[in-house]
Each structure stands twice: as structure tokens, then as C-alpha cells.
């Protein structure tokens, strides 16, 4: 049973799941809006919102923590300098998930996840 489990496995190993979330979060930060499956979007929401909260502190330790999670200089710079300052006054809820369509190949529900 998966009661109170805490996260979705997404059918991947832990390292693959970590890489997936890292790559999705980099894409979301760079583009502001991406389309993915609903399950991935829900996991990504948690991951990205924690990063934005850390980046909002706007000190060197926050910068290092965000870079450690993303491993992308461009995405880190954009998150710390452009995105996080917009959400300093906001207490969470930095992303929005909008269900879009059912994917033709496997009939899974797709969704847009975007920064609010």
C-alpha cells in the first residue's frame, strides 16, 4: 500500500527520477511554461516551489543551493535574479497546473505547468 508515501515514483529509478525533475525544472525556469503529464507536473510543482522559496532568500548560500539542485548556470541565474524576486511577498503557490488534453499514443492526461 502507498499510504502516506510522499512522492510518485514515475516508473523510474531514483537517479533517473532526480534527473527528470532537474531537467523539467530547468525547462520550466527557462521557458516559463511547459507541457508534460499531470503526474510529472504535480511532482515538478513540489520540486520547483521549494527551489523558488530557497532562491527568494537571495544570498550566496541560496545561490549555491539552487545551483546544486539544478546544475545549470543560466537557469540558476535566471531563477535567483529574475524569478524569485517576483515571489518574495507571495507565500507559496508559484506554479499553476492546467490540464490540456489526452495524449494520443497512450491516453495519458497532459497538462501545462507554468509559473504564475
UniProtKB/Swiss-Prot annotation:
GO terms for cellular component: cytosolic large ribosomal subunit. Keywords: Ribonucleoprotein, Ribosomal protein. One of its GO terms (molecular function) is structural constituent of ribosome. One of its GO terms (biological process) is translation. Pfam families: Ribosomal_L17. It comes from the Bacteria. InterPro entries: Ribosomal_bL17, Ribosomal_bL17_sf. Disulfide bonds: none annotated. The keyword Ribonucleoprotein applies. The keyword Electron transport does not apply. Belongs to the bacterial ribosomal protein bL17 family. Part of the 50S ribosomal subunit. Contacts protein L32. This is Large ribosomal subunit protein bL17. It comes from Sulfurimonas denitrificans (strain ATCC 33889 / DSM 1251) (Thiomicrospira denitrificans (strain ATCC 33889 / DSM 1251)).
Amino acid at each position: 500500500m502507498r499510504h502516506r508515501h510522499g512522492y510518485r515514483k514515475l516508473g523510474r529509478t531514483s537517479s533517473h527520477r532526480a534527473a527528470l525533475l532537474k531537467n523539467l525544472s530547468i525547462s520550466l525556469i527557462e521557458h516559463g511554461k511547459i507541457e508534460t503529464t499531470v503526474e510529472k507536473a504535480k511532482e515538478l510543482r513540489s520540486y520547483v516551489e521549494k527551489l523558488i522559496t530557497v532562491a527568494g532568500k537571495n544570498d550566496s548560500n541560496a545561490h549555491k543551493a539552487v545551483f546544486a539542485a539544478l546544475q545549470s548556470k543560466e537557469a540558476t541565474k535566471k531563477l535567483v535574479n529574475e524569478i524569485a524576486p517576483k515571489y518574495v511577498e507571495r507565500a507559496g503557490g508559484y506554479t499553476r497546473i492546467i490540464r490540456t488534453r489526452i495524449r494520443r499514443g497512450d491516453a495519458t492526461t497532459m497538462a501545462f505547468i507554468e509559473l504564475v
